[in-house]
């Protein structure tokens, strides 16, 4: 029996593997569109993206979020209203300076994020605490002039799948509760997609510009680099004060409300591809697979027998569709069965059904799992239920494999040298004791040649006697470091 597909290329040369798989599986065309840092979602990739967004939208809608759509252009004076915020983005903003041949009186920014534009409109919409909490979200493109090397889906100048949520609250505590809800929503999203993660409170020097604090989700790529896949920000009153946004409070005084914001992006799809793939291509969780079952007829040369196989194929596909499965029949006559197997394995379709003359005569189906390539034969009458059972097994197996890979790439050590070797060797995320001082945190980044991700969230107590390896002071937290994208 064949074993599961190799992951040697996937792990040893991940950047090249990723470029290969998004092209071969017809997910995302990157590098040929004549603007650096911008790619094109191809039809199959767009379907994966849509399925992922259905998960995101479903969880947000079920927790009282309302979808909106704001303009792409933000006037310069709005973007500059919150000074700390614009300082964090100024070097990355795309500016529109002309309309036709005429220079504009006011420069317009291509949205880098929407805190300023949404807060501005909320000043008109929200007047009283009775309207709170208010939770908006939108799925839009954002633009940032990345000066680092761009990577498809991972580091882009146009982020095309930016889900940003923005909420307004009566008090600091209410906003804090919203942060907790947002974290639970994101945990549910990533758990549904079988993507493992750590949750960290970003250090003060790396929090979102204008936020009181930032909580972030990071996963680990096959090459050992950490990838930020989601962030949640407690904005305090920074933006409501900047816009003099006041509402009537319970005690009838006017005061600034409190806000949060949180976002995920194309990186969710990138991590879905990266975490689960292998050397044959994508491995898509059945719950978000655009096609859950591909049916491939293997037709003999004899015309009568060929007709029998094709008739039975149509019957089988109809039965599987009636069972509620997303089914596609690959009846391309110019492709050999082996080429079709390769094609659909690259696309990560969870289940392949093979139908030849034997299956047509015995009223059975030969079923192959994408994750392990194991084959089994089942009667057509039992196929719907059996495939659903197999898809549940596939998801369980994918979850455990991803969890195992992730767990092997977390190191907790008191040795700065061990942490450096771990991070420089791109083996994953290292945790070491930290005194809490920014100077030590920044020096740790230099010494291990990596980036501080933050401290574990929720906060984890540090055992007595642990000390910062740089200054020798008592440790107040574990600090996470890794190579990042």
UniProtKB/Swiss-Prot annotation:
The keyword Transmembrane does not apply. InterPro entries: aa-tRNA-synt_IIb, aa-tRNA-synth_II, aa-tRNA-synth_II/BPL/LPL, Anticodon-bd, Anticodon-bd_dom_sf, Pro-tRNA-ligase_IIa, Pro-tRNA-ligase_IIa_arc-type, Pro-tRNA_ligase_II_C. It comes from the Archaea. It catalyses: tRNA(Pro) + L-proline + ATP = L-prolyl-tRNA(Pro) + AMP + diphosphate. Its main location: cytoplasm. Coiled coil: none annotated. GO terms for cellular component: aminoacyl-tRNA synthetase multienzyme complex; cytoplasm. It is an enzyme of class 6 (ligase). Pfam families: HGTP_anticodon, ProRS-C_1, tRNA-synt_2b. Homodimer. HAMAP family: Pro_tRNA_synth_type3. Belongs to the class-II aminoacyl-tRNA synthetase family. ProS type 3 subfamily. This is Proline--tRNA ligase. The gene is proS.
